[in-house]
Structure formats: C-alpha cells, structure tokens
Amino acid sequence: MRSSIAFLSLALLLVAADAQAAVGSRVLVQDDGSLKINGRVVHLFGIYMPKDGRICDNSIRPIRCASRAASALRFRIRSVVYCENVSKNRDGSLNAVCLISSRGQIFEPKTDLAAYLLNEGLAVALPNAPFEYKTIERIARSQGRGFWGFFADSIN
C-alpha cells in the first residue's frame, strides 16, 4: 500500500513538473513544419514533410506540400505541446515525439502530432519510423487523404 502511494505521488510530481515545463514553452510552427520551442528547433520524429517550396505535382493540380502540413499543425496546436527528445541532429535541432491535448488538461489522452499529419496524408513515414506510423500512412494513402488525394507523379 505504501509503495503504491509513493509511486502515485512520484507520478503526480513528474506529471506536474512536465506540465509546468510545457506550459512555459512558447510553440511556433515554422514554415517547413518544424516546431520552435524555447528557441530550439524540433522536428517531429519518424516522418518526412516535404520542404517549403516543394511541389506535390500530378501535372494537373500542383500544390505546395509544406505549406499544407504547416497550416494543419498551426490549426491543430491550440494547447500545450509535450515533446520527448529522441535524437539530436548535427545542426543542434532535435527529433522528438510531440503530443498535444485538445483542451490542455494533464490527464486527457494526448494526440501524437506526427501521427496526426500522417493520418491527414500530409507527411510520409520514414524507414526508422514506428510500425504504427507506417500503418497510418498506408491507411491515409489507401483512402486518398492529403497528398494521396490525387495520383502524385512525384513529391519533389
């Protein structure tokens, strides 16, 4: 019983500390779809979003890929963003799994931002991505969401 109470107390302290750190963080979605949190650039782990200016082209309906993904992120992020660092890039930016809650409540189920973009068809799962990401991408592709809503000759 005591160990359960101690564990629960520790868990609540960790969640509160995490929430406090996240609440103080200002999140800015950059044009390339990366996040800027406390001055650091954070890329969503496991996905590729075509860089700004690149065209998803089917020769009939060209569309700027990155602007759609960045707009979707800006629309979706309305509360606290919780990021867990996975790796660091040579340029000092981070690759992280980032989650949000729709109403900003600590105990509410979180939405994975990378999974959200994959589900909307606005990103591609990388080879090192979790199996779930690859599955979400395949489903979005089969249902014609986002980039997959037309037969793309290329994503340049």
Model-derived features with residue positions:
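Small beta-barrel nucleic-acid-binding modules, primarily SNase/OB-fold domains
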Residues: 18-156
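Bacterial N-terminal signal peptides
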Residues: 6-15
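Positively charged n-region of N-terminal signal peptides that target proteins for export
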Residues: 1-4
